[in-house]
Protein backbone atom coordinates (compact mmCIF):
# COMPACT_ATOMS: atom_id res chain seq x y z
CA UNK A 1 0.00 0.00 0.00
CA UNK A 2 1.54 3.30 -1.06
CA UNK A 3 0.71 5.89 1.59
CA UNK A 4 3.18 8.64 0.75
CA UNK A 5 1.58 12.01 0.04
CA UNK A 6 -1.83 10.36 0.39
CA UNK A 7 -3.27 13.10 2.57
CA UNK A 8 -2.49 16.65 3.65
CA UNK A 9 -3.02 15.68 7.31
CA UNK A 10 0.27 13.81 7.60
CA UNK A 11 3.54 15.46 8.63
CA UNK A 12 6.16 13.28 6.98
CA UNK A 13 8.93 14.81 9.09
CA UNK A 14 7.07 13.66 12.20
CA UNK A 15 6.66 10.18 10.72
CA UNK A 16 10.36 9.99 9.87
CA UNK A 17 11.32 11.16 13.35
CA UNK A 18 9.57 8.24 15.01
CA UNK A 19 10.52 5.70 12.35
CA UNK A 20 14.19 6.45 13.02
CA UNK A 21 13.90 5.23 16.61
CA UNK A 22 11.13 2.66 16.16
CA UNK A 23 13.40 -0.33 16.84
CA UNK A 24 13.75 0.88 20.45
CA UNK A 25 10.01 1.29 21.08
CA UNK A 26 9.89 -1.54 23.62
CA UNK A 27 13.19 -0.67 25.33
CA UNK A 28 12.01 0.22 28.84
CA UNK A 29 15.08 2.41 29.37
CA UNK A 30 15.15 3.97 25.89
CA UNK A 31 13.56 6.98 24.22
CA UNK A 32 10.06 5.70 24.93
CA UNK A 33 10.62 5.12 28.65
CA UNK A 34 8.14 7.91 29.59
CA UNK A 35 5.40 6.24 27.53
CA UNK A 36 6.01 2.94 29.28
CA UNK A 37 5.91 4.64 32.67
CA UNK A 38 2.69 6.57 32.08
CA UNK A 39 0.91 3.71 30.33
CA UNK A 40 -0.54 2.15 33.51
CA UNK A 41 -2.05 5.55 34.36
CA UNK A 42 -3.48 5.96 30.86
CA UNK A 43 -4.84 2.42 30.81
CA UNK A 44 -6.40 2.76 34.25
CA UNK A 45 -8.06 6.05 33.36
CA UNK A 46 -9.44 4.73 30.07
CA UNK A 47 -10.68 1.47 31.58
CA UNK A 48 -12.35 3.19 34.52
CA UNK A 49 -14.04 5.93 32.52
CA UNK A 50 -15.19 3.48 29.81
CA UNK A 51 -16.54 1.08 32.47
CA UNK A 52 -14.14 -1.65 31.47
CA UNK A 53 -12.64 -2.77 28.17
CA UNK A 54 -13.38 -6.50 28.15
CA UNK A 55 -15.22 -7.55 25.01
CA UNK A 56 -15.27 -4.03 23.58
CA UNK A 57 -14.10 -3.03 20.11
CA UNK A 58 -11.33 -0.45 20.56
CA UNK A 59 -9.36 1.71 18.13
CA UNK A 60 -6.01 3.21 19.15
CA UNK A 61 -5.27 6.15 16.83
CA UNK A 62 -1.57 6.94 16.46
CA UNK A 63 -0.66 3.64 18.13
CA UNK A 64 3.04 3.76 17.29
CA UNK A 65 4.81 0.62 18.51
CA UNK A 66 1.73 -0.61 20.34
CA UNK A 67 2.35 0.12 24.03
CA UNK A 68 -1.22 1.18 24.83
CA UNK A 69 -2.81 -1.06 22.19
CA UNK A 70 -1.24 -4.20 23.66
CA UNK A 71 -2.21 -3.29 27.20
CA UNK A 72 -5.84 -2.77 26.16
CA UNK A 73 -5.83 -6.11 24.34
CA UNK A 74 -4.61 -7.75 27.54
CA UNK A 75 -7.69 -6.30 29.23
CA UNK A 76 -9.82 -8.37 26.84
CA UNK A 77 -10.55 -5.70 24.24
CA UNK A 78 -10.70 -6.36 20.49
CA UNK A 79 -8.09 -3.77 19.50
CA UNK A 80 -7.18 -2.17 16.18
CA UNK A 81 -4.05 0.00 16.13
CA UNK A 82 -3.82 2.76 13.54
CA UNK A 83 -0.65 4.59 12.52
CA UNK A 84 1.02 6.06 9.44
CA UNK A 85 4.54 4.94 10.37
CA UNK A 86 5.54 1.67 8.68
CA UNK A 87 8.47 0.96 11.01
CA UNK A 88 6.57 1.46 14.30
CA UNK A 89 3.78 -0.78 13.00
CA UNK A 90 6.26 -3.49 12.08
CA UNK A 91 7.73 -3.29 15.58
CA UNK A 92 4.22 -3.43 17.05
CA UNK A 93 3.27 -6.51 15.01
CA UNK A 94 6.44 -8.38 15.95
CA UNK A 95 6.11 -7.54 19.65
CA UNK A 96 2.46 -8.62 19.70
CA UNK A 97 3.44 -11.90 18.05
CA UNK A 98 6.22 -12.50 20.57
CA UNK A 99 3.90 -11.60 23.44
CA UNK A 100 0.98 -13.72 22.28
CA UNK A 101 -1.32 -10.70 22.09
CA UNK A 102 -3.77 -10.16 19.24
CA UNK A 103 -3.95 -6.62 17.83
CA UNK A 104 -4.91 -5.70 14.27
CA UNK A 105 -2.39 -3.07 13.15
CA UNK A 106 -3.33 -0.94 10.13
CA UNK A 107 -1.32 1.68 8.22
CA UNK A 108 -3.95 4.26 7.40
CA UNK A 109 -4.99 7.80 8.30
CA UNK A 110 -7.77 8.16 10.83
CA UNK A 111 -9.77 10.15 8.29
CA UNK A 112 -9.64 7.32 5.73
CA UNK A 113 -10.44 4.79 8.43
CA UNK A 114 -13.46 6.83 9.50
CA UNK A 115 -14.79 6.92 5.95
CA UNK A 116 -14.77 3.12 5.84
CA UNK A 117 -15.68 2.27 9.45
CA UNK A 118 -18.13 4.88 10.71
CA UNK A 119 -19.70 4.01 14.07
CA UNK A 120 -17.73 0.77 14.44
CA UNK A 121 -15.96 1.20 17.79
CA UNK A 122 -17.05 1.20 21.43
CA UNK A 123 -13.89 3.07 22.47
CA UNK A 124 -11.46 5.25 20.52
CA UNK A 125 -8.16 6.42 22.03
CA UNK A 126 -5.98 9.16 20.56
CA UNK A 127 -3.05 9.62 22.93
CA UNK A 128 -0.07 11.93 22.39
CA UNK A 129 -0.93 12.17 18.69
CA UNK A 130 -2.82 15.43 18.08
CA UNK A 131 0.31 17.56 18.51
CA UNK A 132 2.05 15.66 15.70
CA UNK A 133 -0.36 16.30 12.80
CA UNK A 134 -1.00 19.44 10.69
CA UNK A 135 -4.77 19.46 11.32
CA UNK A 136 -5.66 18.07 14.76
CA UNK A 137 -9.28 19.18 14.45
CA UNK A 138 -9.68 16.81 11.50
CA UNK A 139 -8.51 13.96 13.73
CA UNK A 140 -11.05 14.89 16.41
CA UNK A 141 -13.81 14.87 13.80
CA UNK A 142 -12.72 11.47 12.49
CA UNK A 143 -12.61 9.99 15.99
CA UNK A 144 -16.15 11.24 16.60
CA UNK A 145 -17.26 9.55 13.39
CA UNK A 146 -15.63 6.24 14.30
CA UNK A 147 -17.25 5.74 17.70
CA UNK A 148 -20.69 4.24 18.27
CA UNK A 149 -23.47 6.35 19.81
CA UNK A 150 -22.89 6.17 23.55
CA UNK A 151 -19.25 5.14 23.01
CA UNK A 152 -16.16 6.76 24.48
CA UNK A 153 -13.33 8.78 22.92
CA UNK A 154 -10.17 9.70 24.83
CA UNK A 155 -7.65 12.36 23.83
CA UNK A 156 -4.35 13.29 25.44
CA UNK A 157 -2.00 16.07 24.45
CA UNK A 158 0.04 18.99 25.86
CA UNK A 159 -1.22 22.42 26.87
CA UNK A 160 0.25 25.46 25.11
CA UNK A 161 1.76 27.91 27.59
CA UNK A 162 5.11 28.92 29.06
CA UNK A 163 5.01 26.27 31.78
CA UNK A 164 4.34 23.50 29.25
CA UNK A 165 7.23 24.75 27.10
CA UNK A 166 9.57 24.78 30.10
CA UNK A 167 8.58 21.30 31.28
CA UNK A 168 7.77 19.38 28.08
CA UNK A 169 10.49 20.88 25.88
CA UNK A 170 13.29 22.45 27.94
CA UNK A 171 12.94 20.11 30.92
CA UNK A 172 12.05 16.80 29.29
CA UNK A 173 14.16 17.16 26.12
CA UNK A 174 17.20 19.24 27.10
CA UNK A 175 17.71 18.95 30.87
CA UNK A 176 16.34 15.56 31.94
CA UNK A 177 16.72 14.05 28.45
CA UNK A 178 13.56 11.99 29.01
CA UNK A 179 12.66 12.20 25.31
CA UNK A 180 14.77 13.00 22.21
CA UNK A 181 15.37 16.63 21.30
CA UNK A 182 12.90 17.83 18.70
CA UNK A 183 10.11 15.54 19.87
CA UNK A 184 7.85 18.49 20.62
CA UNK A 185 7.05 21.84 19.01
CA UNK A 186 5.25 24.31 21.28
CA UNK A 187 3.42 25.79 18.30
CA UNK A 188 1.62 22.44 17.93
CA UNK A 189 0.59 22.20 21.58
CA UNK A 190 -3.17 22.48 22.18
CA UNK A 191 -4.96 24.37 24.91
CA UNK A 192 -7.82 22.46 26.59
CA UNK A 193 -10.28 25.17 25.50
CA UNK A 194 -9.24 24.64 21.87
CA UNK A 195 -9.64 20.88 22.09
CA UNK A 196 -13.03 21.24 23.77
CA UNK A 197 -14.16 23.67 21.08
CA UNK A 198 -13.31 21.09 18.41
CA UNK A 199 -15.13 18.43 20.42
CA UNK A 200 -18.20 20.65 20.68
CA UNK A 201 -18.35 20.79 16.87
CA UNK A 202 -18.95 17.01 16.82
CA UNK A 203 -21.49 14.68 18.46
CA UNK A 204 -18.96 14.18 21.29
CA UNK A 205 -19.49 15.70 24.73
CA UNK A 206 -16.84 16.31 27.39
CA UNK A 207 -17.18 14.07 30.44
CA UNK A 208 -13.96 14.53 32.40
CA UNK A 209 -10.51 16.08 32.15
CA UNK A 210 -7.42 15.27 34.18
CA UNK A 211 -3.82 16.38 34.25
CA UNK A 212 -0.81 14.07 34.09
CA UNK A 213 1.97 15.24 36.41
CA UNK A 214 5.63 14.34 36.81
CA UNK A 215 7.26 14.80 40.22
CA UNK A 216 10.98 15.37 39.80
CA UNK A 217 11.73 14.65 43.47
CA UNK A 218 9.98 11.28 43.55
CA UNK A 219 10.53 10.46 39.85
CA UNK A 220 6.90 9.40 39.60
CA UNK A 221 3.91 10.25 37.42
CA UNK A 222 0.38 10.72 38.74
CA UNK A 223 -3.02 12.02 37.65
CA UNK A 224 -4.34 15.24 39.14
CA UNK A 225 -6.54 18.29 38.53
CA UNK A 226 -3.84 20.58 37.12
CA UNK A 227 -3.93 20.61 33.30
CA UNK A 228 -1.12 23.15 32.78
CA UNK A 229 1.10 20.68 30.92
CA UNK A 230 -0.05 17.15 29.98
CA UNK A 231 -3.73 16.33 30.13
CA UNK A 232 -6.29 13.70 29.13
CA UNK A 233 -9.86 14.39 28.04
CA UNK A 234 -12.67 11.84 28.23
CA UNK A 235 -15.59 12.38 25.86
CA UNK A 236 -18.56 10.28 24.87
CA UNK A 237 -20.78 10.20 21.81
CA UNK A 238 -24.11 11.86 22.54
CA UNK A 239 -26.84 9.44 21.44
CA UNK A 240 -29.15 12.37 20.72
CA UNK A 241 -26.84 13.90 18.09
Curated annotation (Swiss-Prot):
GO biological process entries: methylation
Chain positions recorded as S-adenosyl-L-methionine binding sites: 42, 62, 83, 127
Keyword field: Methyltransferase, S-adenosyl-L-methionine, Transferase, Ubiquinone biosynthesis
EC number in record: 2.1.1.222, 2.1.1.64
Pathway as given in its UniProt record: Cofactor biosynthesis; ubiquinone biosynthesis
Highest taxon, organism lineage: Bacteria
GO molecular function: 2-polyprenyl-6-hydroxyphenol methylase activity; 3-demethylubiquinol 3-O-methyltransferase activity; polyprenyldihydroxybenzoate methyltransferase activity
Catalytic activity: a 3-demethylubiquinol + S-adenosyl-L-methionine = a ubiquinol + S-adenosyl-L-homocysteine + H(+); a 3-(all-trans-polyprenyl)benzene-1,2-diol + S-adenosyl-L-methionine = a 2-methoxy-6-(all-trans-polyprenyl)phenol + S-adenosyl-L-homocysteine + H(+)
PANTHER family: METHYLTRANSFERASE, UBIQUINONE BIOSYNTHESIS O-METHYLTRANSFERASE, MITOCHONDRIAL
Family under the similarity heading: Belongs to the methyltransferase superfamily. UbiG/COQ3 family.
Known function: O-methyltransferase that catalyzes the 2 O-methylation steps in the ubiquinone biosynthetic pathway.
Protein name as catalogued: Ubiquinone biosynthesis O-methyltransferase
Gene name for this UniProt entry: ubiG
Amino acid sequence: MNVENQTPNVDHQEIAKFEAIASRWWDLEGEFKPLHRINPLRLGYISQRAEGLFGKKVLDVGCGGGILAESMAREGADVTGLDMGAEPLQVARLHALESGVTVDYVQETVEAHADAHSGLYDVVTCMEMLEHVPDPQSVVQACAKLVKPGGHVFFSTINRNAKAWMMAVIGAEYILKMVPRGTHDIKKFIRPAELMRWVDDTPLRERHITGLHYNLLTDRFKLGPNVDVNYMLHTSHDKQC
